[in-house]
């Protein structure tokens, strides 16, 4: 027994196959974050994972309380035909309770496969009706146009996770306050019941739509206007049985989240600086705020109900694939609620590689694998279930994190001073499969970069679709695997136009980065080869030809970047930069009304739709 039993790897292998040792000091710090010195073994978890048809022996008699409420008296092996779900086994001799998770083990196949769709940063997809950023009304419009006129079957959006309920607003959708709830900034105010009765609605609408003239998205300005409008609607809200029923169905999680929002408005967004009585969800100030600020507490619950309703309406137009971020802001709602199962002194990142010689730290605290298991995985279950709400599919960002994560001590001199920590991936994948089965949704694992061989094998066995990018693949699209999503690029990588024109290389220099001229040259050669074009071909021709090549991929799902189709040269995010680049703030160059009539998106859609219909 020792360090390896706690999942901490004392060595790691880079992309070139070279092994590196982790310092004993780093190992000790990582173990300390788990509350151990590495002696002995982690305590057993309270959950038993079962697959249909698998005999599970049982000593003595017990009552099996099914999730639906029925109770079965069992002696000997558990029944092999248990329904999928979360059940509870209560032993008759000592009353000991064990969670029994019955999972199908594999995720559903995409119903419409093969099909295609747009990958879009929703905030960037503004229409003339938007208030400075794309919203759920825009998603509904984009989905209707894509499915009814273009023949597409999905829209992949950036994470819609909840941001902090205060100013300033975070620009990054991958650094949320909570992954269990969603961002009210995406609400279409005019679609909220009661909005037409506002006396100053017209002036608010005009001010909101004027924000569309700004070259970059100003979330703080959007927040101020939408908060003003929504608070006025709430003041006139007299109740709705549908809201009451929805609140009841959400359980304690919604109330705890709303309490965090009220406390954040009172004490500031970082709970670690709050008064001691509010610093833990069980603190006396938390119960007090639910009583003394009942109206404000309900207001934040109402906002989540509105988001849920508008997202449901948008999802009725097309299957929406929701993106699950790797983690959360440690100062936010999930960090507060789950502080006992998160390693708050650690940050998720990546070891050194050819792109980042010192490694990367993303500032997101990881789950402690053993405390998470000890909690019956409920935080993870809630996170997956929430992201699957009104979803046709689930994109798991950095899916390798279900197997292992690079933990960086916040005291480390650089991200290179970290270590890999392994997770109980079988349990986590069983939960993903069960939740996807319940939601009728497929799963896609973003498995780009350095990936252990067994990871892709296990994901394939679980029917989690792989990710294939033209930018990363040496093989032509026609040779990609079937069980995958294929695309040209992502939000962190150059667009076709940016690469082809050379503007992305110039942007790297503008952002203060070391321009990767050789890497750009190689990527451009790959693009030329895949698209089958001459080196001086017009960028519009290159874009269409590239997606025609992508259409030959046998993959179940294909996605096209809407910014790619419009010839956008700037990528949404420049990794390694902060204020040097307008990360997550670049809108599409045309409103959706213009997108619908522009030739580029129709040409790309026609190329991909031919594959889906052939």
Q: Where are these predicted regions, by residue range?
A:
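Conserved, mostly hydrophobic/aromatic
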Residues: 3, 87, 146, 260, ...
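Acidic/aromatic-lined carbohydrate-recognition and catalytic surfaces
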Residues: 28, 32-39, 47-59, 65-69, ...
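Hydrophobic faces of well-ordered beta-strands that scaffold small-molecule active sites
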Residues: 116-120, 153-157, 320-322, 394, ...
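Short, solvent-exposed turn/loop segments enriched in Gly/Ser/Thr/Pro and often Arg
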Residues: 156-167, 324-329, 397-403, 446-449, ...
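Active-site-adjacent "subsite" loops/lids of carbohydrate-active enzymes
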Residues: 184-185, 190, 330-378
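Conserved alpha/beta catalytic core and glycan-binding cleft of carbohydrate-active enzymes
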Residues: 239-242, 447-569
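Active-site-proximal helices and loops of the catalytic beta/alpha 8
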Residues: 327, 331-354, 406-509
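Low-complexity, glycine/alanine/valine/leucine- and proline-rich hydrophobic stretches
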Residues: 566-601
């Amino acid at each position: 027994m020792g360090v390896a039993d706690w999942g901490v790897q004392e060595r790691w292998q880079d992309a070139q196959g070279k092994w590196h040792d982790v310092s004993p000091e780093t190992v000790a710090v990582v173990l300390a974050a788990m509350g151990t010195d590495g002696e002995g073994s982690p305590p057993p978890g309270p959950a038993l994972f079962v697959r249909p048809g698998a005999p599970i022996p049982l000593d003595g008699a017990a009552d099996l309380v099914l999730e639906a409420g029925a109770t079965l008296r069992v002696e000997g092996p558990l029944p092999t035909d248990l329904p999928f779900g979360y059940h509870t086994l209560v032993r008759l001799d000592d009353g000991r309770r064990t969670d029994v998770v019955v999972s199908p083990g594999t995720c559903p196949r995409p119903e419409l496969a093969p099909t295609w769709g747009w990958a879009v940063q929703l905030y960037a997809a503004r229409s003339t009706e938007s208030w400075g950023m794309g919203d759920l009304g825009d998603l509904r419009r984009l989905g209707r146009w894509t499915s009814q006129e273009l023949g597409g079957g999905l829209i992949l959006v950036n994470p819609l996770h909840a941001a902090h309920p205060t100013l300033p607003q975070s620009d990054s959708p991958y650094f949320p306050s909570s992954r269990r709830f969603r961002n009210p900034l995406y609400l279409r105010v005019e679609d909220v019941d009661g909005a037409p009765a506002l006396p100053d609605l017209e002036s608010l609408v005009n001010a909101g739509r004027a924000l569309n003239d700004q070259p970059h998205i100003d979330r703080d300005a959007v927040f101020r206007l939408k908060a003003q409008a929504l608070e006025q609607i709430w003041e006139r809200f007299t109740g709705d049985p549908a809201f009451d029923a929805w609140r009841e169905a959400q359980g304690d999680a919604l109330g705890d989240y709303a309490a965090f929002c009220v406390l954040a408005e009172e004490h500031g967004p970082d709970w670690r600086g709050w008064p001691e009585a509010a610093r833990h969800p069980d603190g006396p100030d938390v119960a007090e705020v639910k009583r003394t600020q009942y109206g404000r507490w309900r207001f934040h619950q109402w906002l989540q109900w509105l988001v849920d309703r508008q997202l449901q309406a948008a999802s009725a137009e097309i299957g929406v694939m929701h993106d699950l971020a790797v983690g959360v802001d440690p100062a936010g709602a999930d960090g507060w609620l789950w502080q006992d199962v998160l390693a708050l002194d650690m940050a998720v990142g990546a070891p050194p590689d050819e792109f980042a010689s010192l490694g990367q730290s993303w500032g997101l605290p990881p789950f402690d694998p053993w405390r998470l298991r000890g909690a019956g995985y409920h935080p993870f279950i809630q996170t997956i279930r929430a992201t699957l709400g009104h979803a046709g599919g689930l994109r798991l960002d950095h899916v390798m994190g279900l197997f292992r994560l690079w933990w960086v001590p916040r005291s480390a001199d650089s991200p290179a001073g970290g270590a890999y920590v392994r997770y109980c991936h079988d349990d986590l994948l069983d939960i993903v499969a069960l939740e996807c089965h319940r939601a009728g949704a497929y799963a896609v694992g973003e498995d780009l970069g350095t990936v252990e061989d067994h990871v892709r094998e296990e994901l394939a066995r679980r029917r989690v679709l792989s990710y294939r990018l033209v930018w990363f693949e040496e093989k032509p699209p026609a040779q990609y695997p079937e069980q995958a999503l294929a695309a040209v690029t992502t939000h962190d990588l150059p667009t076709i136009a940016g690469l082809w024109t050379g503007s992305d290389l110039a942007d790297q220099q503008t952002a203060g980065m070391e321009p990767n001229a050789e890497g750009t040259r190689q990527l451009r050669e790959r693009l030329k080869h895949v698209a089958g074009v001459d080196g001086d071909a017009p960028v519009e021709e290159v874009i269409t030809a590239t997606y025609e090549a992508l259409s030959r991929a046998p993959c179940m799902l294909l996605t096209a970047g809407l910014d790619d189709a419009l010839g956008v040269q700037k990528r949404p995010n420049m990794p390694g930069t902060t204020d040097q680049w307008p990360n997550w703030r670049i809108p599409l160059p045309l409103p959706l009304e213009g997108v619908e009539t522009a030739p580029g998106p129709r040409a790309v859609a026609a190329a991909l739709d031919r594959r889906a219909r052939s």
